[in-house]
Amino acid sequence: MIRGCVFMDFKEKVLDIVEIAGKTVLSAIPVGGALATSIYDIVKDNCLAKRQEMWKDALEQRISKIESTLEAIGNNDSFTTALVKSTELAMRTARQEKMDYLANAVVNSYKFNIEEEKLIIFIDLLDKYTISHIKILKFFYNPRQFAGTNCSCYTMGSPKTILFEVYPELDNEIFKKIYDDLYVDGMVNTKDLNITMTDSGMFAKRTTSLGDEFLRFILL
């Protein structure tokens, strides 16, 4: 774990990167005319400033727990790539949960030392996915683990039946779009869930090895 003055020095360097990357995102917003400039300034000073503080807090909580030396982390290319890309993405969301996943990805990029191509793909997927994408992917990793799911009451049915029992607020049309995304991206192994199967099939794991690896990357 990074402690004391060493951690404070490292934290300041990381937060400097956050500041620079955040400003880079802001500078990419086209501004022209007095009204547009005024709106831009309000957004920058309020919503985006709040997001930057949320992101700094999420990073600090996780970085302080890394078991390593300052030099090892500072010289890790995967960590640096994840930090810069995730900072840019954090400015695009107001959801704390999404920022938490991004911060987890930064830490895990160091812990797992993922090669850069896969690292960039995973971070891009995290940018693309909504919280519901991740919720559904986590469900299909292990349907039996979810509270409120009574495995004994089913003999035949569709895996969707269990999902909608656990998450009754899900919209069916939105779910179809989300599940198609997950399938096309190679996160799940079953294309069509509109099928009837035995109870063991209903509760079967449906994430692929790539989907499992992606979940490990964004969770702590």
PLM ranges: what are they?
Residues S38, I42, N76, S86, ...:
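Short acidic/histidine-centered micro-motifs embedded in hydrophobic/aromatic stretches
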Residues V6-A58:
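Membrane-inserting effector segments that mediate pore formation, membrane fusion
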Residues D45-L89:
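Amphipathic, membrane-active segments
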